[in-house]
Amino acid sequence: MKKVLFFFFFLTAWSLYSEAQVANEDKHRLIVTTDLGGTDPDDIQSMIHLLLCSNVIDIEGLISSQVWMDDPDKTAKISEVVEQFGEVLPRLNKHAEGYPSLNQLRAIIKRGQPSSNMTGVGQGKDSPGSELIISVVDKKKDQRSVWLAAWGGMNTIAQALWKVKHTRCLLYTSDAADDL
Protein backbone atom coordinates (compact mmCIF):
# COMPACT_ATOMS: atom_id res chain seq x y z
CA MET A 1 0.00 0.00 0.00
CA LYS A 2 2.84 2.39 0.83
CA LYS A 3 4.35 1.80 -2.60
CA VAL A 4 1.04 2.60 -4.31
CA LEU A 5 0.62 5.81 -2.28
CA PHE A 6 4.19 6.82 -2.99
CA PHE A 7 3.66 6.15 -6.69
CA PHE A 8 0.52 8.34 -6.81
CA PHE A 9 2.24 11.05 -4.79
CA PHE A 10 5.17 10.96 -7.20
CA LEU A 11 2.87 11.16 -10.26
CA THR A 12 0.95 14.08 -8.76
CA ALA A 13 4.12 15.96 -7.87
CA TRP A 14 5.60 15.30 -11.31
CA SER A 15 2.47 16.50 -13.13
CA LEU A 16 2.36 19.70 -11.06
CA TYR A 17 6.05 20.32 -11.73
CA SER A 18 5.54 19.70 -15.45
CA GLU A 19 2.61 22.12 -15.59
CA ALA A 20 4.68 24.79 -13.86
CA GLN A 21 7.51 24.30 -16.36
CA VAL A 22 5.16 24.52 -19.34
CA ALA A 23 3.48 27.61 -17.91
CA ASN A 24 6.84 29.36 -17.52
CA GLU A 25 7.91 28.41 -21.04
CA ASP A 26 4.65 29.81 -22.39
CA LYS A 27 5.31 33.24 -20.89
CA HIS A 28 6.52 35.74 -23.45
CA ARG A 29 9.66 37.78 -22.77
CA LEU A 30 9.09 41.52 -23.06
CA ILE A 31 11.12 44.73 -22.99
CA VAL A 32 9.23 48.03 -23.05
CA THR A 33 10.64 51.39 -24.08
CA THR A 34 8.39 54.19 -22.90
CA ASP A 35 8.31 57.97 -22.83
CA LEU A 36 6.30 57.79 -19.61
CA GLY A 37 6.63 61.00 -17.67
CA GLY A 38 5.38 63.40 -20.29
CA THR A 39 1.98 65.03 -20.43
CA ASP A 40 0.15 62.00 -21.80
CA PRO A 41 -1.73 60.14 -19.01
CA ASP A 42 -2.21 57.00 -21.11
CA ASP A 43 1.49 56.13 -20.62
CA ILE A 44 0.97 55.71 -16.88
CA GLN A 45 -2.25 53.78 -17.46
CA SER A 46 -0.47 51.45 -19.91
CA MET A 47 2.36 50.83 -17.43
CA ILE A 48 -0.11 50.03 -14.64
CA HIS A 49 -1.96 47.63 -16.94
CA LEU A 50 1.31 45.95 -17.95
CA LEU A 51 2.34 45.49 -14.32
CA LEU A 52 -1.06 44.01 -13.47
CA CYS A 53 -0.49 41.46 -16.25
CA SER A 54 3.12 40.78 -15.26
CA ASN A 55 2.24 37.40 -13.78
CA VAL A 56 1.71 36.03 -17.32
CA ILE A 57 4.56 37.90 -19.05
CA ASP A 58 8.27 37.91 -18.27
CA ILE A 59 9.07 41.61 -18.22
CA GLU A 60 12.82 41.89 -18.76
CA GLY A 61 13.23 45.62 -19.27
CA LEU A 62 11.47 48.92 -18.58
CA ILE A 63 13.42 51.57 -20.47
CA SER A 64 12.89 55.32 -20.41
CA SER A 65 13.04 56.69 -23.95
CA GLN A 66 12.90 60.05 -25.68
CA VAL A 67 10.57 60.86 -28.54
CA TRP A 68 10.54 64.33 -30.07
CA MET A 69 13.05 66.27 -28.01
CA ASP A 70 15.98 65.70 -25.71
CA ASP A 71 14.40 65.31 -22.29
CA PRO A 72 15.87 64.72 -18.87
CA ASP A 73 16.11 61.18 -17.55
CA LYS A 74 12.60 59.97 -16.75
CA THR A 75 13.41 56.64 -15.14
CA ALA A 76 12.19 58.14 -11.85
CA LYS A 77 8.67 58.23 -13.30
CA ILE A 78 8.84 54.53 -14.17
CA SER A 79 10.19 53.84 -10.66
CA GLU A 80 7.30 55.80 -9.16
CA VAL A 81 4.72 53.60 -10.91
CA VAL A 82 6.65 50.44 -9.97
CA GLU A 83 6.77 51.51 -6.30
CA GLN A 84 3.02 52.11 -6.32
CA PHE A 85 2.57 48.67 -7.85
CA GLY A 86 4.67 47.30 -4.99
CA GLU A 87 2.03 48.53 -2.55
CA VAL A 88 -0.64 46.25 -4.07
CA LEU A 89 1.69 43.37 -4.91
CA PRO A 90 1.01 41.40 -1.68
CA ARG A 91 -2.73 41.42 -2.43
CA LEU A 92 -2.16 40.41 -6.05
CA ASN A 93 0.03 37.51 -4.92
CA LYS A 94 -2.87 36.21 -2.79
CA HIS A 95 -4.96 35.75 -5.93
CA ALA A 96 -2.44 34.72 -8.58
CA GLU A 97 1.07 33.35 -8.84
CA GLY A 98 3.95 34.50 -10.99
CA TYR A 99 4.26 38.22 -10.27
CA PRO A 100 7.82 39.56 -10.30
CA SER A 101 9.11 40.93 -7.03
CA LEU A 102 9.54 44.63 -6.49
CA ASN A 103 13.33 44.16 -6.51
CA GLN A 104 13.16 42.31 -9.84
CA LEU A 105 11.26 45.22 -11.37
CA ARG A 106 13.58 47.83 -9.87
CA ALA A 107 16.58 46.05 -11.39
CA ILE A 108 15.26 46.25 -14.96
CA ILE A 109 14.44 49.98 -15.03
CA LYS A 110 17.03 51.61 -17.26
CA ARG A 111 17.61 54.88 -19.04
CA GLY A 112 17.54 54.79 -22.81
CA GLN A 113 19.11 57.24 -25.22
CA PRO A 114 19.45 60.77 -23.80
CA SER A 115 19.08 62.26 -27.30
CA SER A 116 15.92 62.05 -29.37
CA ASN A 117 15.45 60.52 -32.79
CA MET A 118 18.43 59.12 -34.71
CA THR A 119 20.81 61.69 -33.18
CA GLY A 120 20.97 59.24 -30.27
CA VAL A 121 22.23 56.37 -32.42
CA GLY A 122 25.79 55.54 -33.43
CA GLN A 123 29.36 55.11 -32.24
CA GLY A 124 29.79 55.85 -28.53
CA LYS A 125 26.07 56.39 -27.93
CA ASP A 126 25.32 53.25 -25.95
CA SER A 127 23.01 53.64 -22.97
CA PRO A 128 22.07 51.39 -20.07
CA GLY A 129 18.83 50.67 -21.95
CA SER A 130 20.49 49.67 -25.22
CA GLU A 131 22.97 47.50 -23.30
CA LEU A 132 20.10 45.83 -21.44
CA ILE A 133 18.36 44.97 -24.72
CA ILE A 134 21.52 43.30 -26.03
CA SER A 135 22.17 41.37 -22.81
CA VAL A 136 18.59 40.10 -22.61
CA VAL A 137 18.58 38.92 -26.24
CA ASP A 138 21.99 37.27 -25.74
CA LYS A 139 20.87 35.12 -22.78
CA LYS A 140 22.05 31.67 -23.78
CA LYS A 141 19.92 29.79 -21.26
CA ASP A 142 16.64 31.28 -22.49
CA GLN A 143 15.86 30.60 -26.14
CA ARG A 144 12.40 32.21 -26.13
CA SER A 145 11.96 35.21 -28.41
CA VAL A 146 12.19 38.68 -26.89
CA TRP A 147 9.38 41.05 -27.77
CA LEU A 148 10.28 44.76 -27.90
CA ALA A 149 7.37 47.13 -27.32
CA ALA A 150 8.12 50.71 -28.36
CA TRP A 151 5.67 52.86 -26.41
CA GLY A 152 7.79 55.92 -27.04
CA GLY A 153 10.87 56.65 -29.07
CA MET A 154 12.56 53.73 -30.78
CA ASN A 155 16.12 55.03 -30.83
CA THR A 156 17.20 52.90 -27.85
CA ILE A 157 16.16 49.81 -29.80
CA ALA A 158 17.89 51.29 -32.86
CA GLN A 159 21.11 51.79 -30.85
CA ALA A 160 21.07 48.17 -29.68
CA LEU A 161 20.64 47.00 -33.27
CA TRP A 162 23.33 49.42 -34.49
CA LYS A 163 25.83 48.14 -31.93
CA VAL A 164 25.16 44.48 -32.72
CA LYS A 165 25.49 45.17 -36.44
CA HIS A 166 28.80 47.01 -36.03
CA THR A 167 30.50 44.92 -33.34
CA ARG A 168 29.65 41.33 -34.09
CA CYS A 169 31.63 38.98 -36.30
CA LEU A 170 32.56 40.37 -39.70
CA LEU A 171 34.17 38.38 -42.50
CA TYR A 172 37.03 39.68 -44.59
CA THR A 173 38.69 37.53 -47.19
CA SER A 174 42.02 38.47 -48.69
CA ASP A 175 41.36 36.59 -51.88
CA ALA A 176 38.37 35.51 -53.90
CA ALA A 177 38.77 31.81 -53.23
CA ASP A 178 35.80 29.48 -53.36
CA ASP A 179 33.61 31.93 -55.32
CA LEU A 180 32.98 34.11 -52.25
Regions of interest found by a model, annotated:
Residues Q123-T167:
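Internal, conserved structured core segments that host functional sites
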Residues V32-G37, T119-G120, S145-V146:
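Second-shell loop/turn segments in exported
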Residues D26, L51-K140:
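Glycine-rich nucleotide/cofactor/substrate-binding loop typically near the N-terminus or early
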Residues R29-T33, E60-S64, W147-A150:
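Structural recognition of the beta-strand scaffold that forms the well-ordered cores
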Residues V4-T12:
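Sec-dependent N-terminal signal peptides
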Residues Y172-L180:
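Single conserved hydrophobic/aromatic residue that forms the stacking wall/gate
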Residues S18-A20:
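Boundary at the C-terminal end of the N-terminal hydrophobic targeting segment
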Residues Q45-C53, L161:
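Histidine-anchored nucleotide/phosphate-binding helix
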